[in-house]
Regions:
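A solvent-exposed interaction/effector surface
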Residues: 1-172
Length: 172
């Protein structure tokens, strides 16, 4: 587990309002369309698929905003595809690598939230999942970075600059 500031990113993204029970219909489908659109418009993809959740409470009946996104090298001056473009600011967060089936994501999130409570870190209400490796045939091969947003004030308490001038962050 690590407290870090994810760097600002450009995204090609899809946004929807949804609930937990509806997430399955987006798996694989939207990412594939994002890749197609990026290739069609010659957009340089610079990383794996991101899923971002805003307003997520963990309760089945509560709606939240879901963004499914691909990071891009730059935002094009002209784009007429089927998705949206945005630049996201730096994202202070508690990060953890989850290896294996996504069925176990809930337990990994519980560990992060427990850690945040122990450390007195205030959540920002935003969650991100970075799908480093997706293996539908062998889910134990999945590698997902979980990022739980924290308020900048919480992040600043943990940040320090060592003698060589390179920022370093606490890691557990």
């Amino acid at each position: 587990m690590q407290i870090k500031e994810a760097k600002p990113l450009n995204f090609l993204y899809f946004r929807t309002k949804t609930r937990i029970g509806e997430l399955g219909r987006f798996v694989g489908v939207i990412a594939q369309e994002l890749y197609r659109d990026a290739v069609r418009y010659d957009l340089e993809i610079t990383g794996p698929v991101y899923w971002s959740y805003q307003g997520f409470t963990g309760r089945d009946s509560d709606p939240f905003t879901l963004d499914i996104a691909l990071p891009l090298a730059e935002l094009p001056g002209s784009y007429h595809g089927m998705f949206q473009l945005k630049r996201e600011d730096a994202f202070p967060c508690v990060s953890m690598i989850h290896e294996g089936s996504w069925v176990g994501l809930q337990n990994s999130y519980a560990r992060i939230l427990e850690f945040m409570t122990e450390q007195g870190l205030e959540g920002s209400g935003k969650f991100r999942e970075v799908y480093i490796n997706i293996d539908f045939m062998n889910p134990t091969g999945n590698v997902t970075e979980l990022q739980v947003g924290i308020h900048p004030e919480s992040f600043e308490r943990f940040r320090h600059v060592p003698a060589d001038g390179v920022p370093a962050y606490a890691s557990w």
